[in-house]
Design a protein with these regions (language model features):
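Alpha/beta-hydrolase active-site loop
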Residues: 16-37
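Short beta-strand/loop motif that positions the catalytic acidic residue
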Residues: 119-122, 126-129, 133
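Conserved alpha/beta-hydrolase "acid-adjacent" motif
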Residues: 134-140
């Protein structure tokens, strides 16, 4: 799932839904794959950037999904809000206003955008991130790492050196592919 260019499934009114509804598309694809003969324990998800949000949310809704690879994604809405407000040089006091306006315009509550709270002890995750990511700061990666350790959630991590946002797959394609292959082979049995 890659929502960096957004798709028609994510449009609510004239605004993007931050992946909060598109997890239903992922569940539809999961059901379709089962319908054409794939076993549910052989279907994993790979989400890139914002695309990891619906992948994580879909896995939360469908426990049969056992392996989720999340590349350069966000952990919690409040972290993103703080990052984005800071990026534009605004005071954090603008946060509630930005959140409220976003909810009114899009029809979705951005405070529901908390993938870290959708992680399960019954699934396996792989989080990768670029150490120089300026779009989605490394603090999100570190938060996932801390949260999964604290909550005994099965997760692996790779902080790709000298890499920016969703850059590791291009900068280190062989390593990326090898790690991904091993992760899915190990967790889709």
């Amino acid at each position: 799932i890659d929502l960096r260019n957004y798709g028609q499934s994510d449009i609510v009114s004239a605004y993007e839904d931050l992946g909060l509804k598109s997890y239903n598309d992922v569940l539809g694809a999961f059901d379709y794959l089962k319908h054409i003969g794939f076993k549910s324990n052989k279907i994993g998800l790979h989400g890139i950037s914002l695309g990891a949000v619906p992948a994580i949310f879909a896995a939360y809704e469908e426990p049969a999904i056992k392996a989720i690879w999340a590349d350069s994604t966000l952990a919690e809405f409040n972290m993103v809000l703080k990052d984005e407000i800071g990026r534009y040089g605004l005071s954090i006091e603008f946060g509630p206003v930005v959140s409220f306006v976003g909810q009114r315009l899009s029809g979705v509550d951005p405070s529901d955008l908390n993938p870290v709270k959708k992680l399960s002890n019954d699934q396996s995750y792989f989080f990768t991130h670029g150490d120089k990511d300026e779009r989605m700061f490394v603090s999100h990666f570190e938060y996932f790492k801390s949260f999964t350790k604290k909550n005994n959630i099965k997760a692996s991590f790779w902080l790709a050196e000298d890499s920016y946002h969703v850059d590791a797959m291009f900068k280190y394609p062989e390593i990326y592919a090898d790690k991904m292959q091993k992760f899915f082979i190990e967790n889709l049995k």
